[in-house]
């Protein structure tokens, strides 16, 4: 059971996209990375080929390391920024559940 899962809302802690938040689209455990919607946008230039007669510029979300991400305890509003939190685990009724360390509530 991972601390960050698909469809979780996360915030970026460091780098060019610091402070941005988005939903996790995909996890890549081998690289310890995740693809987050709207974060770490890269552009790729494709050369013209037989299939594609004109070249094109493609934008896509590149993977970002999990160490640069934190789960969002409370979503951002106009007045307050998002509150990042660490994740802990607790066993209730013989089930392991994730707990937000800042709020103490189940995720």
Swiss-Prot record:
Subunit structure and binding partners: Part of the 50S ribosomal subunit.
Protein name: Large ribosomal subunit protein uL24
InterPro entries: KOW, Rib_uL2_dom2, Ribosomal_uL24, Ribosomal_uL24_CS, Ribosomal_uL24_KOW, Translation_prot_SH3-like_sf
Disulfide bonds: none
Entry-linked SUPFAM superfamilies: Translation proteins SH3-like domain
Domain of life: Bacteria
Keyword field contains Chaperone: no
GO cellular component: ribonucleoprotein complex; ribosome
Similarity field: Belongs to the universal ribosomal protein uL24 family.
Annotated GO MF terms: rRNA binding; structural constituent of ribosome
Gene that this sequence comes from: rplX
GO BP: any one term: translation
Task performed by this protein: One of two assembly initiator proteins, it binds directly to the 5'-end of the 23S rRNA, where it nucleates assembly of the 50S subunit. One of the proteins that surrounds the polypeptide exit tunnel on the outside of the subunit.
Record NCBIfam families: rplX_bact
Keywords: Ribonucleoprotein, Ribosomal protein, RNA-binding, rRNA-binding
